[in-house]
Curated annotation (Swiss-Prot):
Record-level GO BP terms: diaminopimelate biosynthetic process; lysine biosynthetic process via diaminopimelate
Entry's EC annotation: 1.17.1.8
Family to which this protein belongs: Belongs to the DapB family.
Oxidoreductase as UniProt keyword: yes
GO CC, any one term: cytosol
Origin organism lineage: Bacteria, Bacillati, Cyanobacteriota, Cyanophyceae, Synechococcales
Source organism superkingdom: Bacteria
Gene name tied to this protein: dapB
CDD domains tied to this protein: DHDPR_N
Pathway(s) per entry: Amino-acid biosynthesis; L-lysine biosynthesis via DAP pathway; (S)-tetrahydrodipicolinate from L-aspartate: step 4/4
EC category: oxidoreductase
Record's function text: Catalyzes the conversion of 4-hydroxy-tetrahydrodipicolinate (HTPA) to tetrahydrodipicolinate.
Protein name: 4-hydroxy-tetrahydrodipicolinate reductase
Main location: cytoplasm
C-alpha cells in the first residue's frame, strides 16, 4: 500500500489555509505534517483544534525553513501548499524548491519576472511547482467558455470582485483570463472614440491585447468574475461565483497529487497534464 503524500500548509490559519487543512484531513492519500502561520497567539497550538476538527497532533509554527527541512526527510516526496501573502510568496517558493519540497501556490501577486525566475529555479532543481491563480473547476470552465466566445466578439472587458482583505488587484484569476484571451492573437476593443477619464482609473486597468480589467473590493464578497462581451445589439456575460471556499478543495487536492510527477513550473489548473 502506498504511503500518503506528506503536506505542509503555509498560511494554515487563514481562510483558505483552514479549508485546506480540513480537506487534507478528510482525504486518505494525503497527510498533514506541518502547519505554518505567523500569528504569535497560535504558536504551538494544535492546528486541528484551531480549525474545529479536534486534535491532529500538528502544532502550528512560524519556522518555515525548519518545517521544510523536516518535511524533506519524509519517506515520500513532500508538498507545501502556500496561501500566504504576495509580499513573501516569492521567497517562500524559492525556499521550498531549495529543500526539494514541491510547492503548490495559491497566493497571487507574482509578476512575470518572478514567475520566470522561479520556473528556471525549479527546472534546474528538477522540482515540480504549480502556481494556480484559481483552484475552482467552475472558474476553469468559465475561462474555456470565454476563449470560445472570444472568437466571435471583438469587444470584451473583465470585472472581478473579491472580499476586502484581498491584497492584490487585479486578481491573478482576472489576469490569467486576459492572458488566455490574448494568446488567441487578436487585438480586442478597437477604439470607437477618443476617451478622456475625468477621474484617473475610471475605465479600469488595461491588460494584454487592450483588455480592460475592473476590480471591486467589498466585505460580503468571496471571489467572483464576469467576462463581458459586446457586439451591436447584444451583450454576452459569463460569470462565476464562489459561494464557499470549499469549492476550491478538489482543485487543491488535484494539484497536490500531480505536482510530484512534474518538473518545472506550471501556471494554471488548466495546464496540469
Amino acid at each position: 500500500m502506498a504511503h500518503p503524500i506528506p503536506v505542509v500548509v503555509n498560511g494554515a490559519t487563514g481562510k483558505m489555509g483552514r479549508e485546506t487543512i480540513k480537506a487534507i484531513a478528510a482525504a486518505d492519500d494525503v497527510t498533514l505534517v506541518g502547519a505554518i502561520a505567523r500569528s504569535a497567539d497560535v504558536q504551538g497550538q494544535d492546528i486541528g483544534e484551531i480549525v474545529g476538527l479536534g486534535p491532529l497532533e500538528v502544532p502550528v509554527t512560524n519556522d518555515l525553513e525548519g518545517m521544510l527541512c523536516l518535511a524533506s526527510q519524509e519517506r515520500e516526496v513532500p508538498v507545501v501548499v502556500d496561501f500566504t501573502h504576495p509580499d513573501c510568496i516569492y521567497d517562500n517558493v524559492r525556499k521550498a524548491i531549495a529543500y526539494g519540497v514541491r510547492p503548490v501556490v495559491g497566493t497571487t501577486g507574482l509578476n512575470n519576472e518572478q514567475l520566470q525566475e522561479l520556473a528556471e529555479f525549479a527546472e534546474k532543481a528538477s522540482v515540480g511547482c504549480l502556481v494556480i491563480p484559481n483552484f475552482s473547476i467552475g472558474m476553469v470552465l468559465l475561462m474555456q467558455a470565454a476563449i470560445q466566445a472570444s472568437r466571435f466578439y471583438d469587444h470584451v472587458e473583465i470585472l472581478e470582485l473579491h472580499h476586502d482583505q484581498k491584497a492584490d488587484a487585479p486578481s491573478g484569476t482576472a489576469i490569467k483570463t486576459a492572458q488566455m484571451l490574448a494568446e488567441l492573437g487578436k487585438t480586442f476593443n478597437p477604439p470607437k472614440v477618443t476617451e478622456k477619464e475625468t477621474m484617473p482609473g475610471a475605465r479600469g486597468a488595461v491588460g494584454p491585447e487592450n483588455i480592460r480589467i475592473h476590480s471591486v473590493r467589498l466585505p460580503g464578497l468571496i471571489a467572483h468574475e464576469e467576462v463581458i462581451f459586446g457586439a451591436p445589439g447584444e451583450i454576452l456575460t459569463l460569470r462565476h461565483d464562489t459561494m464557499d471556499r470549499s469549492c476550491y478543495m478538489p482543485g487543491v487536492l488535484l494539484a497536490v497529487r500531480k505536482v510530484r510527477q512534474l518538473t518545472g513550473l506550471i501556471y494554471g489548473l488548466d495546464r496540469i497534464p
